[in-house]
Amino acid sequence: MSARPGVVYLVGAGPGQMGLVTGRARELVATADTLIYDRLIPAALLEYAPAGCDVIDAGKRAGDHTLSQEEINALLVDAASQGRAVVRLKGGDPFVFGRGGEEGACLQQAGIPFEVVSGVTAGISVPASAGIPVTHRNVSNHVTLVTASAGPDGSGEPDYAWLAASEGTVVLFMGLRRVRRVADGLMSAGAPRTRPVAVISRGTTPRQRTVTGTLETIGDLVDAGQLVSPALIVVGDVVELRDQLNWFEQRPLFGHRIVVTRARAQASSLATHLRDLGADVVEAPTIRIEPINDDGLADHVRSCADTDMLIFTSRNGVDRWFGALHAT
């Protein structure tokens, strides 16, 4: 179903890997009049936007907001009021630390119809890509999703006493710069210093990096690893299962960046295969195949009955030759 005029779609774009974007999300992007996106979405998703679509970067980084939340809210209301089909793209799921609830409330108050399109949340998919199940029958029967980012006035600090007493898994969003503070807070609240911890950077993407340790050691390990955001912190005994279940980072081409220079029409299948093997693929076509008028080719094709062997130096030659053969 295409995006409808005058409606705002709050769309989750998944944790970063293009393959984890839902079909509904792609469909809405492809029919949007206005597209407002955050920085954590897969860049390739923007290529689905149609010609003439207003594409607006509303990306937020720590201490560097392209647009304030109030400005984003105003954009959504204004664009929809003009009868435009508006897609608001967010990393992960819009209702899991995505401020989708705030934007939905603003739209409701303004009388603007909206729909929520759920996405794959990073809180579950990113640990999975690091070989860490957030629940396990013999290890953890519950998971708690927490934001490690406090408000400007210092409010919103995690309830370390409650988390320290939990025997389940704790997943903390937006905490890379606060790893030491989180670890110290949990230990001060009584959590064992040996409690396993993982920090996963750029999860589900070919640039994923994972550091594991304990509450006591994780701060130094993260500093030494020079991890970058976005990153998740996973605390709990399930982290130890990574030794058995680390599948994503064990693929044969993981950690390798490969540039594919084939013509665009032919590059996608190769690029997909390389990505399935774990590679970070950059498609950079350096050639373009164009048909030429070659009246003599048909004569050559007809004369091949007396030929013992045909040698083709590229797929393009095969396509051109047999196209002429079928036409004769």
Segments from the language model and where they lie:
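Phosphate-coordination loops involved in phosphoryl transfer and adenosine-cofactor binding
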Residues: P5, G83, E167, F254-H256
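Signature of uroporphyrinogen-III synthase
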Residues: S2, G16, T205-T328
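Conserved anion/nucleotide-ligand pocket segment
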Residues: A150-A198
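Acidic, glycine-enriched active-site microenvironments
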Residues: A105-C106, T121, S125-A128, V134, ...
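Class I S-adenosyl-L-methionine
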Residues: M1-M18, G23-V120, S125, A224, ...
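Short, solvent-exposed amphipathic alpha-helical segments in soluble enzyme
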Residues: G23-L28, A49-C53, E102-C106, G131-I132, ...
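Class I SAM-dependent methyltransferase SAM-binding "motif I" and its flanking Rossmann-like core
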Residues: Q17, G91-S166, V211
